[in-house]
Amino acid sequence: MDPLGPGMIVNSHLTGLYIAGDVVGLLARAIGGTVLTVWQTIWMGGLLVWVGTAAMMVWSYFKAMHLVTTTYRLQTTKPLPGGKLRVLQISDLHPGKGAVDRKRIPELNRRIRELNPDMILFTGDIFDEHVERPDFDSFNAFFATLDPPGGKWFVLGNHDLFHHWREPSYGRADLEGAFARAHIRILEDVSQLAYVGKDATPVRIVGRKDWLYTQGNRFTPAQLMPNGPDNVYTILLDHEPRELKADAAAGANLILSGHTHGGQIWPTGLVAKLFRYNELNYGMKQITPACAAIVSGGTGTWGYKIRTEGKTELVMVEIEQKDA
């Protein structure tokens, strides 16, 4: 059973509006007179809350379905292929029940080809236990048509193989076979060098096993990058934004994560920030002068075509080589 059913989602927003309404009511009481009388008439009838919640649910659908491109620009003194690197991050696609299904593949295809990335990095939860086989097959066929010169790289999320709520339409062998045919390299606690076309300048891609999927039983950043910082630009992929300082200390220059969805359904993001569940909930943070971390809000949505926090996005990272 999904923990966030439609009733729970509506109730959470009703509660939020009731609290906001009570705060306004206290202000109206302090002002008194006609303001208080009008507010009591509206509020006690409950009309404002129900209309507000209905409007919010309609707005949340369009917010979920509106795919944007978020661009970050970075600089490095390390050598890059041709002096620059354009990296596209796709994360938390969750095709099927969420905002993205196979009907949106033409839109994704157009958007990705317009961006013309040097490499595509998938940071987990590209599939989950809700995906139906037609969506699974259609997206893998689509991925196979993408041919960035620096390759396609993938790390597992907590949903890709660790299925929480139901038996999936695919297994590990299906995923590995489909990705092999699409020339997507799966990185599970592995570090590899990538090359953009025929340029001899390498970029290191480090892929970590998902923390939740492994319950923390995975290689440390220092084990994955035993030589520490060197002159090779290093991109580390980790589905969940954890151990960012350790990643940076071991030699990562760019850390890409997803998982948080930017909150997606209020008050999930607020609670995550209050309890510091993730080291970074959304956006970019400079961990050290030589390392930045970016957390995507997700290229899709989990479970429902609803988003009241964050945004549905493709993330483009443009890295420029500068003089030391």
Put a short name on every predicted segment.
Residues 2-5, 32, 74, 106, ...:
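Short amphipathic alpha-helical coupling elements at transmembrane boundaries
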Residues 43, 53-78, 97-103:
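Hydrophobic alpha-helical transmembrane segments in integral membrane proteins
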Residues 1-65:
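Non-catalytic terminal accessory segments
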Residues 14-18, 72, 133, 153-155:
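Non-transmembrane, interaction-prone segments in cytosolic or luminal domains
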Residues 79-324:
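Soluble catalytic domains of enzymes that build or remodel membrane lipids, polysaccharides, and related
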